[in-house]
Amino acid sequence: NLEDYSIFWQVLKRDTAENLMHILFVASKLDDIDNYLDIVRQSGLNPVVVDVRCFATRNALALREDLTKSDAPVAIVEFGAFENYILILYKDSPFISDIYLSEKDRNTLMDQDSTDEQIKGISNRFSMQVSQMISSYTAKYKTGSINSLLISSSMPNLERTIGNFNEALPNVDVEVFDTLL
């Protein structure tokens, strides 16, 4: 029974000529996870189970019927101090790619006293990578255009960056995506 497992998968490569797909498939039996938790508890420790952020984001997106019912791909960007990636979902197939953000830029984004000019420069560099990844994805997988970009972040300066993302990605509707709602 599939409900007994926590499952994630991603198509890594499609070979239409050979009618083959390379797939990354990760699954954990929920009972096994519970057994390991019991062992840790018996040793006197209090374990905490955390859903990997990109999995949690994907699970939160499943609750947004306005986006998941569409035939268009949906892009979610994690813009944070520790993780930066784009997750593109199309017909239930996830595609995940890392986005580079330097340590200096991370520190600037975390600093409430950073200037609008600093934030804009970082946002523009980040947006350029997002734009390139979206273009590469739509060209490689022959999908329609991506019109909606959801940004998930724990950064204190997120509201200051949304306008910059909208400016840098004029053909995409950018909105904050709160995975906790």
Where are the predicted features?
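Hydrophobic/aromatic-enriched cytosolic interaction surfaces used to assemble or bind macromolecules
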Residues: 1-181
